[in-house]
Amino acid sequence: MLLFWMWWALLAVFRAFPGIDIYFSQLFFVGADCDATAAAGNICGGFPYRDVAAFDLLRTVFFRLPYVVAIVMVWKLVECYQQHGATFNAERAQKLKVALGTLLIGPVLLVNVVLKEHWGRPRPIQTDIFGGALHFAEAGSLAGKCVSNCSFVSGEAASAGWLFCLLLFVPKSLRYAVAAPLAAISILTPAMRLSFGAHYLSDVVLGWLSSLVVFAALLALTESQQHQKNSEI
């Protein structure tokens, strides 16, 4: 519940102070002289990090990584259910279902199907204060004119948040070795989306946190059901 209310509290802060989003995007925006065809008052320029080949390659790798991990998890879940009786690992199956359920409900459905397709917030690069054609819309606003695959919230940040959740399921013997690179990927992914002008700070923060909210809710639900079953035995 704490994560749930934290998400809404952060949304309220970003809505009340939209200058936070504008400020952090301005850190990565480089202005340029407009050409003769530009209308008077237009702002010209761009986000140079999006044109760096190394960053673009990293973004591609980080974008695909959660879904590669998910495919491996599906395979492991199928393996679990090929076992029966004493050889069936119920705990592993439960963890895999929570992890895959979080990815499906959070980044896939909530973020990419519901929020990004219906909230209409233009990305920074689409916004007139950063050289685009659309007006700025604050976090959570329905007034934006983006038509599809919009800025609120970041799907890649949500997937990165999901990867971070998996640390809880990593065996203790591997946790220290895996924690640092996984945490780095989880933080770098939303940071790059911000630096590319693809999302505002609120989009990446709320997208990342949304996966933790869904993960915590599913984990609490499964643990409650397991506790209820144990009490009935």
UniProtKB/Swiss-Prot annotation:
Transmembrane segments: 2-22, 61-81, 95-115, 150-170, 177-197, 201-221
Organism expressing this protein natively: Rhizobium leguminosarum
Class in the EC hierarchy, top level: hydrolase
Record topology, Extracellular segments: 23-60, 116-149, 198-200
Entry's Gene Ontology BP terms: lipid A biosynthetic process; lipopolysaccharide biosynthetic process; response to antibiotic
Full protein name: Lipid A 4'-phosphatase
Involved pathway(s): Bacterial outer membrane biogenesis; LPS lipid A biosynthesis
Compartment list: Cell inner membrane
